[in-house]
């Protein structure tokens, strides 16, 4: 990022300075979209409510606060309990902060003035949250635009702004959500700089993990190392999601690492490791998966499966450009996986027939990737008019859109040997006819391989943000402690 002038978020040392002008530009983009919408009347005002601090169940133990994502996108405010309003006609923005009691200074530190927040976030105006009713009344809005809509990844409804006195205003809660979501789909240059930074630090952390892993370690030791590196070197207090540190058969558990399986297995000689981890900086995510042999050397079978996934990953990235339909990229990955599994002897028969039978969904039951930004599964995958395709494999896609410049996505093909899916396939004559059971048996307990990259769609191709060893030779050299430079994949830009 160019030298930052004006107010910025910065955690010192070598961390990234992020100008708060990033959020002013986001508010400007939102107003421009809304003004073009014929349903938006003159005098409309956007009202967003930030996140609130929460406690651990019935205790007084605070859960570490992280800002609500839409509010962060628009204002970049790190404090809880705030509101923000934006005059659509003028673009003028007002931040509302809590009026804190004097006792706050004893327990939590200095109570800052409204002028402090105005300067910190480069706002047009700052008022207290208990004044929002009177301030909005004085502005005489024709309508308040509040945020209500469904997140297509979680199925949850985002929280709509509410405050004492809102009932006396005319409120529209249908216009704002699709417009602000579409703004979030396309990243500005300043946003891309932050995502390059999150990828830089997280990539370095993955390389440190690959150098440190040893047979006999606990999976959580590597989780700890990753998070320590991201925080100590990158200022990343939060991870983008719960770390997945799967070894052996755990590497076939797609969302391993949860409370019931907390990265607690002892890594064994001969295991494949699948580590899916990403640090978060100033609410901007990264999402990177590396797969490698625990002992630093690929077996023939591990190499065959790994290089099958690497081939599909690079084929997809090489094909990405504006206008490409994302479901076609999933079909491309499936075909390559089936070709390679046939080459290893696990499958036999016509690859075209395998594709028709949707056999690829047996070895890759998840989608191919997702939008990435302020949320790891970022919004905008299925706007109105984009329908989910009800076919095995394709129904798991987190988006079915055509690619456009400025979109940031993950590319994460994988091949997994999941017992219950294999058993179902072998019990289905339409699938069983393709399997060589004797060869397949050799891969039972193998686990899985996933390669996950973060990329931005450019005017003519894509830019790879992630920088980790990917070829078999690069991985083995890294795990042996070699600091020899490697060349990241570069498709058309």
From Swiss-Prot:
GO terms for biological process: collagen catabolic process; negative regulation of programmed cell death; proteolysis. It catalyses: Xaa-L-Pro dipeptide + H2O = an L-alpha-amino acid + L-proline. Mn(2+) 1 binds at residues 276, 287, 452. Homodimer. It comes from the Eukaryota. Keywords: Acetylation, Collagen degradation, Dipeptidase, Hydrolase, Manganese, Metal-binding, Metalloprotease, Phosphoprotein, Protease. Pfam families: AMP_N (PF05195), Peptidase_M24 (PF00557). CDD domains: Prolidase (cd01087). This is Xaa-Pro dipeptidase. Binds 2 manganese ions per subunit. Dipeptidase that catalyzes the hydrolysis of dipeptides with a prolyl (Xaa-Pro) or hydroxyprolyl residue in the C-terminal position. The preferred dipeptide substrate is Gly-Pro, but other Xaa-Pro dipeptides, such as Ala-Pro, Met-Pro, Phe-Pro, Val-Pro and Leu-Pro, can be cleaved. Plays an important role in collagen metabolism because the high level of iminoacids in collagen. The gene is PEPD. A dipeptide binds at residues 255, 287, 377, 398. Belongs to the peptidase M24B family. Eukaryotic-type prolidase subfamily. The modification Phosphoserine is found at residue 167. Mn(2+) 2 binds at residues 287, 370, 412, 452. Its EC number is 3.4.13.9. The modification N-acetylalanine is found at residue 2. Its cofactor is Mn(2+). One of its GO terms (molecular function) is metalloaminopeptidase activity. PANTHER family: PEPTIDASE D, PTHR48480. It comes from Pongo abelii (Sumatran orangutan).
């Amino acid at each position: 990022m160019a030298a930052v002038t004006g107010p910025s978020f910065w955690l010192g040392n070598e961390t990234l300075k992020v100008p708060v002008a990033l959020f002013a530009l986001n508010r400007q983009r939102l107003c421009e979209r809304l003004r073009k919408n014929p349903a938006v009347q003159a005098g409309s005002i956007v009202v967003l409510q930030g996140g609130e601090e929460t406690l651990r169940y019935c205790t007084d133990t605070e859960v570490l606060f992280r800002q609500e994502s839409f509010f962060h996108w628009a204002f970049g405010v790190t404090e809880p309990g705030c509101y923000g309003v934006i005059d659509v006609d003028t673009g003028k923005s007002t931040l509302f902060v809590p009026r804190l009691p004097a006792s706050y200074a004893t327990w939590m530190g200095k109570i800052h003035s409204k002028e402090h927040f105005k300067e910190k976030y480069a706002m047009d105006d700052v008022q207290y949250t208990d004044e929002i009713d009177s301030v909005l009344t004085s502005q005489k809005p024709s309508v308040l635009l509040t945020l209500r809509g469904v997140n297509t990844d979680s199925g949850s409804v985002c929280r709509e702004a509410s405050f004492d006195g809102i009932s006396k205003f005319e409120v529209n809660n249908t216009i704002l959500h699709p417009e602000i979501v579409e703004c979030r789909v396309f990243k500005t240059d300043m946003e891309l700089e932050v995502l390059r930074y999150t990828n830089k630090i997280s990539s370095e952390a993955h390389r440190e993990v690959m150098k440190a892993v040893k047979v006999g370690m606990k999976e959580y030791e590597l989780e700890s190392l990753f998070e320590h590196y991201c925080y100590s070197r990158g200022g990343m207090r939060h991870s983008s999601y719960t770390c997945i540190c799967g070894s052996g058969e755990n590497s076939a558990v797609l969302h391993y690492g949860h409370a019931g399986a907390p990265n607690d297995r002892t890594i064994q000689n001969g295991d494949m490791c699948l580590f899916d981890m990403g640090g978060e900086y100033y609410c901007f995510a990264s999402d990177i998966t590396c797969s490698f042999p625990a002992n630093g050397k690929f077996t023939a079978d591990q190499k065959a499966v790994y290089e099958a996934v690497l081939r599909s990953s690079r084929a997809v990235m090489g094909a990405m450009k504006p206008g490409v339909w994302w479901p076609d990229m999933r079909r491309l990955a499936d075909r390559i996986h089936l070709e390679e599994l046939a080459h290893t002897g696990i499958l036999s028969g016509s690859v075209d027939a395998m594709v028709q039978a949707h056999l690829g969904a047996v070895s890759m039951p998840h989608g191919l990737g997702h939008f990435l930004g302020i949320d790891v599964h970022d919004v905008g995958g299925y706007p109105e008019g984009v329908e989910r395709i009800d076919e095995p494999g394709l129904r798991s896609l987190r988006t079915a859109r055509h690619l456009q410049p400025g979109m940031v996505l993950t590319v994460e093909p994988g091949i997994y040997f999941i017992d219950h899916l294999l058993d179902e396939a072998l019990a289905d004559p339409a699938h069983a006819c393709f399997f060589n059971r004797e060869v397949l048996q050799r891969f039972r307990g193998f686990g899985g391989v996933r390669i996950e990259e973060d990329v931005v769609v450019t005017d003519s191709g894509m830019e790879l943000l992630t920088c980790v060893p990917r070829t078999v030779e690069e991985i083995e050299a890294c795990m042996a402690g070699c600091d020899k430079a490697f060349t990241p994949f570069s498709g058309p830009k």
